[in-house]
């Protein structure tokens, strides 16, 4: 099974190709940036390996305590290594943590209109693509 750096190199090489193609096709730079930020977060922070003592979890320092329930719930290389499901679960998990943090800080939940812009969708797609590439590399090796 490839290590943390092998996953990062593979993911970023693929993203460089995606970015070059997108730039060549005159994709909006802001949209490419949204995809790239999601891809970065999906590669370096919300990896399928958050359920092990991986480099990704160690990089979080004391914040890794937030992922203990995730680690206890998911067995490594099972549902967390599903191409779409794993990324969606991690996105929902971190969203719940952010919502609780917001509530603790402001004593209320966010109000106002919930919106889905193209940038949010591209950000989430970036996370899902990074997750899919991680799983693909694990399957190959």
Predicted regions, residues:
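N-terminal membrane-targeting hydrophobic helices
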Residues: 1-141
């Amino acid at each position: 099974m490839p290590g943390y750096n092998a996953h990062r190199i593979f993911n970023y090489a693929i993203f460089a190709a995606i970015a070059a193609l997108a730039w060549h096709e005159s994709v909006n730079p802001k949209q490419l940036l949204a995809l790239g930020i999601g891809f970065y977060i999906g590669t370096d922070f919300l990896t399928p390996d958050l359920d092990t003592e991986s480099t990704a979890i160690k990089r979080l320092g004391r914040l890794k305590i937030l992922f203990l329930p995730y680690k206890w719930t998911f067995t490594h290389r099972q549902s967390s290594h599903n191409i779409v499901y794993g990324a969606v679960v991690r996105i929902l998990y971190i969203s719940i943590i952010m919502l609780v943090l917001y509530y603790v800080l402001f004593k209320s939940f966010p109000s106002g209109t919930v919106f889905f812009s193209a940038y949010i969708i591209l950000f989430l797609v970036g996370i899902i693509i990074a997750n899919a590439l991680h799983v693909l590399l694990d399957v190959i090796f």
